[in-house]
UniProtKB/Swiss-Prot annotation:
Self-interacts. Interacts with FtsZ. SUPFAM superfamilies: Actin-like ATPase domain. Residues 291-303 have a biased composition (Polar residues). It is found in: Cell inner membrane. This is Cell division protein FtsA.
Length: 492
């Protein structure tokens, strides 16, 4: 009988929930259904910056999106919901999902090393697996932590640096890795909510990683590139160098803050400020330039829509431009903090919903003057077909990246959120992708190997948690912008 697998990608974003249903058949991954809800349709109590705030509210929102995508795909949306779930853990949905995870609730450890000795003087995937797990154990994470990604970026074999040690002769393999982890409670809550939504988690991928998979070229990753997923309430930065992830950072700024600035500064309710941003947003505007329309009439806060006032269009656009510039300054500081600024031959790539704002690329280029800047949307690659036109949009980079991750878009070697080693036999990602567990995976000519007995135990480590929401620290501003930013800084 012909093997067919259904997989779902689910992006739990700050301002929207997205789902893609894909089918694996005859070595090809084909998208057959998609759905999403934006912030106007999602209960604000459900999800905040990617974190589950209410199991009941979140499960309803996620379930609705997933079922809509299933219906488009011609699947029975209720096939998993008809089974009772008296207790968590007693119910196992038929459908599996790859789910995004917000960088807001992760920490990372850089430059951790692990060592493994070879058998028969040849490096196999077993030795690479043991070296990676050795590094994870050496990181000394507490038992209440969960590793999402362990990402090797450098190998040495008998003290000689090599790009890919697999199959090479040698006795001592050393690996240098970048680890991304979170609290186990976060993972357990995510698992509960997804089961209540009718799917079982197959894997978890941080959103910035998923976005980079969907948008970056192999050349950019090899040269070094900073990929910024610009969302509603967050920006998530991932930096590649030498085709490996070297740095990731969550930044508590997004397009939502432009709306908040407009609401406070123009004395208008938030929903109207959002409409103003969408209708009149143009980040290419600079003070003193002529605009098509000089004034805009907007409702006044506290008047229940019965009173309005006039504001210059130039003021609206200047407010948004100043906040966007401040966002790029924050992103730039994070790039500098990474120590990798001199390794960005591929420049800066912007994706996510905020990247759709008119003039954002031109504004970014005025700030990032030392390297190229481009806007990116998802593209078809890694044996994936059926990309709907609606998905070729920066807003859907993360959810498309989740499916591409399944299709082999992960880095050359990786220990994933399930503790499984994923790898490619060469740097050419169009070739066969492998994983070390017996779980079927989407790609042509899969190789399955069970290395679960090679997992290394965890050891204690006390680490500081990420701040839930960090304040924006603006640089010196002139005129009313300084007063305004000082006034509202406490809100962010």
């Amino acid at each position: 009988m012909e093997h067919k697998e259904i997989v779902i990608g689910v992006d739990l974003g700050s301002r929207k929930i997205c789902a893609i249903v894909a089918e694996f058949k005859e070595g090809i991954l084909r998208i057959i259904g998609t759905a999403h809800q934006d912030s106007k349709e999602i209960n604000s109590k459900a999800i905040k910056r990617g974190r589950i705030n209410s199991l009941a509210h979140a499960s309803n929102a996620i379930k609705e999106v997933i079922n809509s995508a299933k219906k488009m795909a011609g699947l029975n949306a209720d096939e998993d919901r008809n089974n009772p779930m008296p207790h968590f853990g007693e119910y196992h949905p038929k459908t599996k999902a790859i789910v995004s995870f917000s960088g807001a609730y992760t920490e990372s450890i850089r430059d951790v090393t692990g060592v493994a000795s070879t058998k028969d003087n040849v490096v196999t995937i077993d030795e690479i697996n043991r070296a990676i797990n050795s590094a994870c154990a050496k990181a000394g994470l507490d038992n209440d932590k969960h590793i999402l990604h362990a990402l090797p970026y450098r190998f040495t074999l008998d003290k000689q640096e090599v790009n890919d040690p697999l199959g090479m002769s040698g006795t001592r393999l050393e690996v240098f890795i970048h680890i991304v982890y979170t609290e186990k409670n976060n993972i357990e809550n995510l698992e509960k909510i997804m089961i209540q939504s009718g799917v079982e988690i197959e894997n978890i991928v941080i959103n910035s990683y998923a976005a980079s998979i969907a948008t970056l070229s192999n050349d950019e990753r090899e040269l070094g590139v900073a990929c910024v997923d610009m969302g509603g309430e967050t920006c998530n930065l991932t930096i590649y160098s030498g085709n490996s992830i070297r740095y990731n950072k969550y930044l508590p700024v997004g397009s939502h803050h432009l709306t908040t600035d407009l609401s406070h500064m123009l004395n208008t309710p938030f929903p109207y400020a959002e409409e103003v941003k969408i209708k009149y947003g143009d980040l290419s505007f600079e003070g003193g330039e002529e605009t098509p329309s000089q004034n805009v009439q907007i409702p006044t806060t506290g008047s229940d829509g019965h009173e309005s006032h006039i504001v210059p269009l130039s003021e609206i656009q200047t407010i948004m431009r100043e906040r966007a510039l401040e966002t790029f300054k924050i992103i730039h500081r994070s790039i500098q903090d990474s120590g990798l600024e001199e390794h960005l031959g591929g420049g800066v790539v912007l994706t996510g919903g905020m990247a759709l704002m008119k003039g954002i690329k031109e504004l970014a280029r005025t700030h990032f003057t030392n390297y190229p800047v481009r806007l990116a949307a998802p593209v078809e690659k890694y044996n994936i077909m059926g990309m709907f036109e609606d998905l070729k949009d920066p807003r859907f980079s993360v959810v498309v990246g989740l499916i591409l991750y399944k299709a082999g878009g992960h880095t050359n070697y990786e220990r994933d959120s399930k503790g499984v080693i994923r790898y490619h036999e060469s740097d050419d990602y169009t070739r066969t992708a492998h994983q070390s567990s017996p779980t079927p995976h989407i790609h042509s000519s899969p190789t399955e190997r069970n290395l679960s007995d090679l997992k290394a135990p965890s050891a204690p480590l006390n680490t500081a948690k990420n701040d839930d929401f960090l304040p924006i620290k603006p640089t010196e501003q002139k005129g009313f912008f300084k007063s305004f930013l000082d006034k509202i800084s406490k809100f962010f």
